[in-house]
Amino acid sequence: MKSRNGPLRVGIGGPVGSGKTALTEKLCKAMRDDYSVAVVTNDIYTTEDAEALVRMQALTSDRIVGVETGGCPHTAIREDATINLQAIAGLNRRIPDLDVVFIESGGDNLAATFSPDLADITIYVISVCQGEEIPRKGGPGITRSDLLVINKKDLAPYVGADLEVMDRDATRMRASRPFVFSDMKRGDGVSSIVSFLREQGGL
């Protein structure tokens, strides 16, 4: 499902500390041998996430672009996605054979969504550490993303979160939309997310 503008564009959103950069790293490493992959990261005042991905050796540095959004990070992925679209256009010129571009948003609240002009598929990441009630609080990221990732499941016993409750609430809030529990530190759940992208993205 490459878009009219080139590669499949996958938006990765979620609150600060939920594990967006860790997910982006794992997806790059899982897919880079089979696909031509690039990343655009969004930070308010720095390019910290882009620099982190380079340090993690997720991809070569020419395939990672960091944009500084200023102000509210959700504006750059929703109301005015120009800065991200320009970054993707630059990657397309530099790497004409791109198959997939991951767009990692700046950390934001549960109301953040990607403009359909920017992302073909959206993944929303939440953390077990934010509390077991997060799935039932709803918001566009929880209810309307193409895939919900409930990360840091390994920490549930330490923060008093019941994964069965989170599973039940996510099922209810998302109706038929898929979700997956993950532990990015160990790579648990990554293969399911890659399979989802291959199937839904037509890769």
Swiss-Prot record:
Gene3D superfamilies: P-loop containing nucleotide triphosphate hydrolases. The keyword Signal does not apply. Transmembrane segments: none annotated. The keyword Chaperone applies. InterPro entries: CobW/HypB/UreG_nucleotide-bd, P-loop_NTPase, UreG. GTP binds at G14, P15, V16, G17, S18, G19, K20, T21. GO terms for molecular function: GTP binding; GTPase activity; nickel cation binding. It is found in: Cytoplasm. Its main location: cytoplasm. GO terms for cellular component: cytoplasm. Belongs to the SIMIBI class G3E GTPase family. UreG subfamily. NCBIfam families: ureG. Facilitates the functional incorporation of the urease nickel metallocenter. This process requires GTP hydrolysis, probably effectuated by UreG. This is Urease accessory protein UreG. It comes from Rhizobium johnstonii (strain DSM 114642 / LMG 32736 / 3841). The lineage of its organism: Bacteria, Pseudomonadati, Pseudomonadota, Alphaproteobacteria, Hyphomicrobiales.
